[in-house]
Regions:
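Phosphate-facing sequence motifs and polybasic nucleic-acid/acidic-lipid-binding regions
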Residues: 1-206
């Protein structure tokens, strides 16, 4: 049949042509803030969000050798949720936040869901977006800070014997909600000791 194993075709994220310069500048800015504010490694957090597909399709199939366009069953599955993962520079993994499409708690995992109790004990946060998407919103980002990021920073400051005024550094990507004036203004007013730092656009995977 002249078939061979082929990977489904899809557009890859484009890396900026000046990515090295962007990353170097980001590194210098971060190093400066860490030095000037005496930020210890436990008080530096990196957070990232990613899509988790409920029923992941296969990326490989059999197709005619030399095919330019290859389709697979389930590869375009859109039913998914967002998971926000945070880790500190000293290796501490913070509780996860998940965001589910919908307007009520029924959109989130139920009490009888597999491993639900373990997730709750680990302080996971199950959020519904109150929108028709499962991406982060102003409200879910504020919950992330109020319930996960800020409490972690405050606990670590106490453990390290540092004053409440000690600055901490939080690195996130350039998602539109993250960089919005609304969120930045809220964070500065509500959590003035948390400094925000952005991963250059298109460089998250580097």
């Amino acid at each position: 049949l002249h078939w061979s194993e082929r990977r489904a075709t899809r557009a890859a994220q484009k890396t900026p042509t000046n990515w090295e310069d962007l990353c170097e500048r980001a590194f210098i800015r971060m190093a400066y803030r860490i030095k000037e504010e005496d930020v210890p490694s436990p008080l530096y957090i990196n957070s990232d969000q990613t899509q988790v597909v409920y029923a992941q399709g296969a990326a490989l199939t059999w197709s005619k050798t030399g095919s330019k366009q290859v389709s697979t069953v389930g590869n375009d599955e859109k039913r998914a949720f967002t998971i926000v993962v945070s880790i500190s520079c000293d290796g501490t993994v913070l509780p996860f936040q998940t965001i589910h499409q919908g307007y009520t708690k029924k959109s989130c995992p139920t009490l009888t869901s597999q491993s639900y109790d373990q997730c709750i004990k680990a302080n996971f946060r199950f959020e519904y977006s109150k929108t028709q998407t499962y991406w982060s919103t102003q409200e879910t980002m504020r919950t992330l800070v109020d319930e996960i990021i800020a409490p972690y920073f405050e606990t670590k400051k106490q453990e390290l014997g540092l004053p409440p005024t000690q600055k901490s550094l939080w690195q996130i990507d350039l998602w539109s909600v993250h960089r919005s004036d609304e969120f930045r203004t809220w964070l500065k007013k509500t959590h003035p000791t948390i400094m925000i730092d952005y991963v250059p656009g298109g460089c998250t995977g580097l």
